[in-house]
């Protein structure tokens, strides 16, 4: 049933819910949820690349509207478009290449800078929006910005449309398939969408073999619910 679960995860373009997987392979939803989290942990294998050439970076916030949450998941003192109930994710994508995503604590310089330095080659040209969290990387990279606040989205080769397109795909999966991704497990969901993007040009069979070659990424049920 593990092989069936892996195949279904990799062949569904937008993801598969634990409820649907439980029906497809005839296990409980609790078991299906655990299997999905284990599989997503392995999908980290395609979320660790080194990005070169032209790279776009951008952050997004993941989280449903507070009014739509179950009572035990509502965030106190959260109103309107406040980000208190949302979790930031940083994305970096090499144009015509791969993407890397990391869940972050905040969108501050101290949080963003070391992650970009870890995954983006120093010789790369980096494109971002005008957010101040990227100011520090001017010291290490050729860094160009577009000012979304002033309605500027494209200035020649300076744009962040590629990474924003990736976020669109992630949000579609969030809204259409999963409905809720807890901050605790969000990195594993990000792994799934990152893997899917980075293997978009290869067959499902190749994806299947790639995952089986990376079962070193493991997590126990006790770790998941801790």
Residue ranges with predicted function:
Residues 1-226:
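Residue-level recognition of single "structural anchor" positions
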């Amino acid at each position: 049933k593990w092989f069936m679960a892996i195949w279904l995860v990799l062949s569904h373009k937008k993801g598969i819910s634990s409820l649907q997987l439980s029906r497809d392979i005839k296990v409980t939803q609790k078991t299906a949820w655990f299997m999905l989290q284990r599989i997503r942990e392995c999908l980290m294998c395609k979320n660790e690349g080194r990005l070169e050439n032209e790279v776009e970076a951008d952050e997004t916030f993941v989280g449903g509207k507070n009014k739509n949450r179950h009572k035990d998941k509502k965030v106190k003192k959260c109103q309107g478009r406040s980000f208190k109930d949302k979790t930031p994710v940083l994305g970096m994508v090499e144009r015509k290449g791969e993407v890397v995503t990391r869940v972050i604590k905040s969108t501050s310089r101290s949080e963003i800078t070391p992650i970009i330095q870890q995954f983006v080659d120093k010789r790369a040209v980096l494109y971002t929006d005008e957010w101040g969290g990227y100011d520090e990387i001017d010291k290490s990279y050729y860094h160009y910005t577009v000012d979304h606040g002033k309605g500027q989205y494209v200035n020649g080769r300076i744009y962040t449309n590629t990474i924003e397109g990736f976020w669109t795909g992630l949000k579609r999966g969030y809204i259409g398939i999963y409905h809720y991704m807890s901050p605790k497990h969000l990195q594993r969901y990000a792994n799934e969408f990152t893997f899917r993007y980075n293997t978009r040009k290869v067959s499902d069979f190749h994806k299947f073999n790639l995952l089986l070659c990376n079962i070193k990424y493991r997590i126990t049920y006790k770790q998941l619910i801790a």
